[in-house]
Amino acid sequence: MSGTSSIARSTMAYVLAGGRGSRLLELTDTRAKPAVYFGGKSRIIDFALSNAVNSGIRRIGVATQYKAHSLIRHMQRGWNFFRPERNEGFDILPASQRVSETQWYEGTADAVYQNLDIIAGYEPEYMIILAGDHIYKMDYEIMLHQHVERQADVTVGCIEVPREEATGFGVMQVDDTGRITAFLEKPSDPPGMPGQPDIALASMGIYVFKTKFLFDVLRRDAADPDSKHDFGGDIIPDLVENGTAIAHRFSDSCVRSSKTAEAYWRDVGTLDSYWQANLDLTNVVPTLDLYDSGWPIWTYNEISPPAKFVYDDVGRRGMAVDSLVAGGCIVSGASLSRSLISTGCRVHSFSQLHGTVVLPYADIARSARLRNTVVDRGVRIPEGLVVGEDPELDAKRFRRTEKGICLITQPMIDRLG
């Protein structure tokens, strides 16, 4: 955990958590993407919030919009430990037509602009704007120091990604000093990096500003009728052209599982990437280390008993290999391999799960076989259901991606009759 320096103490983190994340399909039918469960007991938003707290930042605002109830309830239960008497604060900021009776949040920049008065009440010297829907560990204090040292108007967090995956990101080009010379939001043909034509330098959706400067920029943007009021589409391209925009490499501030580990950052914006990021945690030495007490991922800890494995008969042995099983689960004569089972689930006798991510309070009946599957919260899998062995049948009954990952929700089960 980072030491609480004066720069962290004088910074406010502002988390943008209003997006749906439609590429996660039915997983976001009832909840915003930042509220989606991850890693057995956490939510996606816990990573950005934990990074802020671990970096020494004690003033946080979270802007919410799309189907925010689940997200707000989670934060009220798990993130209520800040002390106002120490100038700490945690504000949940739903879209509430604060500027206009007809205007909700119309873009990422507008989601900050509409709450300038609340931000001003904390009197932060610096602002760090964060996306609430990525999985990573990062020491924001290092990025803040770079911003101050370079005297930048804005510092943009960036990461190298395969060029073919960069169409969904802001893509930048930088000079030898790290100054951003061009910024394209979600280009159809992303430019490669010098000497690495197959790699693009993508924005992480993390921006550092001096607060007074940010206020001026947002007020000008709000008055521009041609703006879409978006950081990636409007604010950053303008500052690249007319100001000083500096790139901060994620590799410089990533909190790694070991000195030789890769810098782990995942967008988890699709069902395939979400499934893979969860199963990454089942590796013997995962690149993203949830067991690191020096940089913990804070969350709401439900009161639950330890996980329990029962029966040791031939063909009916409760066991798990290369798997994570959260508290409150009972694995009763079932076999799990390379799977992640969230809080409060039941897996009944003779069932077999491989490469399966099960969200909280699901119930897997006897003799089910699930392979390469995501099971939504509270789903009741019927006895003998087989998923992941017949692609054509899976596609008819459930949501199946081109890579063969199946999503199962309760309405899909109900339609089976």
UniProtKB/Swiss-Prot annotation:
CDD domains: ADP_Glucose_PP, LbH_G1P_AT_C
Top-level division of the source organism's lineage: Bacteria
Keywords in alphabetical order: ATP-binding, Carbohydrate metabolism, Glycogen biosynthesis, Glycogen metabolism, Nucleotide-binding, Nucleotidyltransferase, Transferase
Keyword Cytoplasm recorded: no
Chain residues that bind alpha-D-glucose 1-phosphate: Y105, G170, E185, K186, S203
Enzyme class of the recorded protein, top EC level: transferase
GO BP term, pick one: glycogen biosynthetic process
Family matches, as Pfam families: Hexapep_GlmU (PF24894), NTP_transferase (PF00483)
GO molecular function, one term: glucose-1-phosphate adenylyltransferase activity
Coiled-coil region(s): none
Catalytic function, reaction form: alpha-D-glucose 1-phosphate + ATP + H(+) = ADP-alpha-D-glucose + diphosphate
Pathway the protein takes part in: Glycan biosynthesis; glycogen biosynthesis
Database matches in Gene3D superfamilies: Hexapeptide repeat proteins (2.160.10.10), Spore Coat Polysaccharide Biosynthesis Protein SpsA, Chain A (3.90.550.10)
E.C. number(s) listed in UniProt: 2.7.7.27
Stated family: Belongs to the bacterial/plant glucose-1-phosphate adenylyltransferase family.
Assembly: Homotetramer.
Classification via NCBIfam families: glgC, PRK00725.1, PRK00844.1
Function: Involved in the biosynthesis of ADP-glucose, a building block required for the elongation reactions to produce glycogen. Catalyzes the reaction between ATP and alpha-D-glucose 1-phosphate (G1P) to produce pyrophosphate and ADP-Glc.
Name of the protein this chain belongs to: Glucose-1-phosphate adenylyltransferase
